Amino acid sequence: MQNRWKDWVHVTKLDPDKSLPPAVIDEIATSGTDALMLSGTLNVTIENLGHLFKQVAQYGLPLVVEPAGPEAVLCEGIDLLFVPSVMNSNSVQWIVGKHQQWAQQSSIRWDKVIPEAYIVLNSSSSVGKVTGADCGLTPAEAAAYASVADHYFRFPIVYVEYSGMYGDPKMVRSIAEVVDRAILYYGGGISSADKAAEMGRWADTIVVGNAVYDLGPDVLRATVKAVQ
């Protein structure tokens, strides 16, 4: 599992603060997606994270927790922890501060941790607001963040996050052209096979989240087929 994640092309993001009936969970888990990421920005607790984990654990898919902060990290039974640092945040808290708190408060399973260099590009999103991200970047500015993340800090993942809004393919292309070693993730507004294929042209891995709740499993399956 430690390196198999590098081969994923489609990840489904599930929010612990949102609920889905068991039948829909079953359709998601059998859609062909490579992994399930348990992740949210607001109102994530150990309790609702644990509840979501119990819903999805039975399917045998790789399970990733992407914690929003040190107060809600689930490790037991989870394959990997994808831990974001928001490169374009105006606050050191979201780059390294919360990570320092986590290390001070907890005994961390570092063998499960995969660091992510987030570049947040939707100022209206919860993650954009909470982290104070500078979302008005030009393609050249965003690419520079990605280059620093890849070549200087050696992040294994560079994650372009539009969070609920479909992004600019030219922006993603500019970032893809400077990322050599890291795996490039794209998330935001993928609500059709065409959008999945368009972003999948530049990103190594696409992440589908809101469409699961807004449009249902059929759309999710279409996005899987578009990139696999």
From Swiss-Prot:
Q: Which SUPFAM superfamilies match?
A: FMN-linked oxidoreductases
Give the enzyme's EC designation. Answer: 2.5.1.41
Residues spanning the membrane: none
The record's section on InterPro entries has: GGGP/HepGP_synthase_I, GGGP/HepGP_synthase_sf, GGGP_HepGP_synthase, GGGP_synthase_archaea
> Annotated pathway, please?
Membrane lipid metabolism; glycerophospholipid metabolism
| A single GO BP | glycerophospholipid biosynthetic process
Q: Which domain of life is it from?
A: Archaea
| Location (main, coarse) | cytoplasm
Q: What are the binding positions for sn-glycerol 1-phosphate in this chain?
A: K13, Y159, V160, E161, Y162, S163, G164, G189, G209, N210
Cell compartment(s), UniProt: Cytoplasm
Q: Which family does it belong to?
A: Belongs to the GGGP/HepGP synthase family. Group I subfamily.
Its biological purpose is as follows: Prenyltransferase that catalyzes the transfer of the geranylgeranyl moiety of geranylgeranyl diphosphate (GGPP) to the C3 hydroxyl of sn-glycerol-1-phosphate (G1P). This reaction is the first ether-bond-formation step in the biosynthesis of archaeal membrane lipids.
What name goes with this protein? Geranylgeranylglyceryl phosphate synthase
